[in-house]
Structure formats: C-alpha cells, structure tokens
Amino acid sequence: MTEQFWQQKKLEEMTEQEWESLCDGCGKCCLHKLMDEDTDEVYYTNVACSWLNSKTCACKDYPKRFTSGEECLKLSRENIAEFNWLPLTCAYRLLAEDKPLPEWHPLITGSKSAMHAAGESVRNKVVYAIDVKNWEDHITNHPHRS
C-alpha cells in the first residue's frame, strides 16, 4: 500500500485493499441502532451483533457476514452517502466529509492499541441481544456522537 494513501486519493479511487484498511476495527458499526419512529433519529446502543467478538472487536466470521442471517450491511464507495449513522470517528465517514483521520487510527499508529487505549472501540463494552430485555435501556448516546 502507498504510504498515507488516504490523504492522496478519494474514496472512489482506492483499491479494495486500501478501502478495507480504512476500517479501524472499533466495532461501533456492529452495534444495533434504534430509530425514533417520529423523528427518524438514530440512537446507538451497546447491543452487539451476535457475530461480534467483544474482546477483539472483530466479526467471528467476517467472510460470511453478509449471509449469516444478521443484518450486516455492506459499506461501499457507491453507497457511503446512505450511511449517515456511521460514528463520527469512522474513517469512511471522515474521509467522505474531507476530514482527517484521528491520531489514534491504526493507519497512523500502526496498531489498534492506541484506539483501544483512547476508548474508541467497543472492546468489553457490549452486551448481546439474547441478554437484553428493554432495548431502550441500552441506548448509549445521542445520535451522531462518537
């Protein structure tokens, strides 16, 4: 990969490898969201997809994530504008908005350690739907806050 390719290319110009490497692996996109029926506001919860490993923040079966029966959505160059619910720290969202990557991003630091240390991942912060009785009790923040 070209060094700092994300500063030199637009999202649509990136190779598949570059595109995939933008994901910091925080796991935030693997959390269930709730939508207010009246306002269409999206609320984040700490309820994880059953395929998310809460320690590694990675999908337990990444290659099969779109056929697993879970509601995993494929983020692509063509549909990035539809994903306005992505966290404010998401590299795809940041670059689409012409903003820089955060200083803890693995592409900058070389590892995920800084992301975890900054508290920007869902590591050990989630519950699974099977354990949830009232989803509204699991709302973690206001829409679009990181």
Curated annotation (Swiss-Prot):
Taxonomy, superkingdom:
Bacteria
Q: Name one Pfam family in it.
A: CxxCxxCC
Family per record: Belongs to the UPF0260 family.
Cite the HAMAP family for this sequence.
UPF0260
This one is known as UPF0260 protein VF_1660
Its lineage opens with: Bacteria, Pseudomonadati, Pseudomonadota, Gammaproteobacteria, Vibrionales
